[in-house]
Amino acid sequence: MQNTLRCVLLSLLLSFSLSLNRVCLNPEGNEVDWYAIFLYPQNSSKEGILSYGYFDASSTSLKYYAYTEETFPPNRVTKYTLSPDTDYNFFFWNDDKTCKDDTESKSASSSKAHAKGELIMDKDNGVFLQHSLPRFPTRMKNGEILTELPGNAGIYGQTFLCISVETQTSYEIAELLNYINVSNNLSVTKDRVNPTENEWIRKLIDNKYSSKYPLTKETVIKSKDGKDFTFFSKSHRQKDVPYDTTLRQKYGTSFFVRTWSRPSLSPMICEDKQLLNVLDVAFDNKKFTYGKDKEHSKWAVSASGNICCFGDLNHTDSQKNRGGHIVCFENENLAKEMRGAIVTSDLCPNKFLAFME
C-alpha cells in the first residue's frame, strides 16, 4: 500500500513538473525566458570536444559548456515534448530530411521555407525553438524520434534561439510559420489536437499553406516575461533576403552577418549603412576558432547599438527563392559578445569598419 501510494505521488509530481515545463530550460534545468546558443564545430578547439556558448535573459556574458545529451537545452525541449503527458500540442519542422534510416526521405521542396524548429504549447505556456541544425530532431523509420543531437552536429557551427511564450502568442507564431510555409517533417498526431484548436495550428498540421499574404511581414512577438522579439518574415515569392535591406533600414545601422557560405556568400553592401559578411570567428578567448567554411549558423549583429538577430536564412543568392524568418531583439551584452567574436569580415573600400560608427 505504501509503495503504491509512493508511485501515485511520484506520478502526480512528474505530471505537475511536465505541465510546468512548457518553457525554455537552461543547462541546469531551470526555467528561463529565452536563450541563445552557439554550438561550435568539434574541431574548432585543441581538445576536440563538442561545446557550446550559452546566453539567456539573465546573462552578462557567454557561458561555455561541454555538450552532454542530458543537459543540452534544446535536447530538453524535445525530451519533454515527447513525454507521456498528452495535455499539449507540438509541431516540428525542418527543411532537410529528418529520417535517419529511410532512403526515401527527401529534403523539402524549394517552395517550402528554409527553416528548422519546434513549437510546443499547453493550455498556458509555449516554447518556440528556432535552430539551424539539419536532421534535428532525428526520426527513425519505425517512427521513433531521437532526442539527442544527430551525428552531423559537430561538423559545422550552429545556432539555437529559444523563446518562452504564452499559449496565445504561440498561435501568432503558428500563423507566421504558415506564412513562410514551413515543411511539416514531424507532425503532431491529430488525436492530440482538440478539434476546436486554433486554426493556424490546424493548418500547420494539415500542411495547408495560404498564399494570401504580403511578400514580407514584420511582427513583434512578446516573450512570457514581456521582451520584444521582432520577426522579419519573407515569403518564397519575395526575391530579397532581409539581411540585404530590411535590417539596415529598420535599425539605421550597419550589420555583420554570419551564415552558411555555400555555394557562395552574397556580396557585401557598401552603402552608407553597410552589410558585411563575417569570415572568421573566435569564441572564449580564441579557444574556439573557425572560418566560414565550417559555419552553418545564421546570425547577425548591428555594428552599433545592441541588435542581435538569429535566422532561418543564409546570406546567399539561393535563399532569395525561400521563405523564412530573421528574429531580432536588443541585448547589450550579447551584442558585445557577438561583435567580439568577429576576427575578420568583409571590408568596404575607402570606408571605416562598420563597428567604428
Model-derived segments and spans:
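PLD/PLD-like phosphodiesterase catalytic module centered on the HKD motif
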Residues: Q2-E357
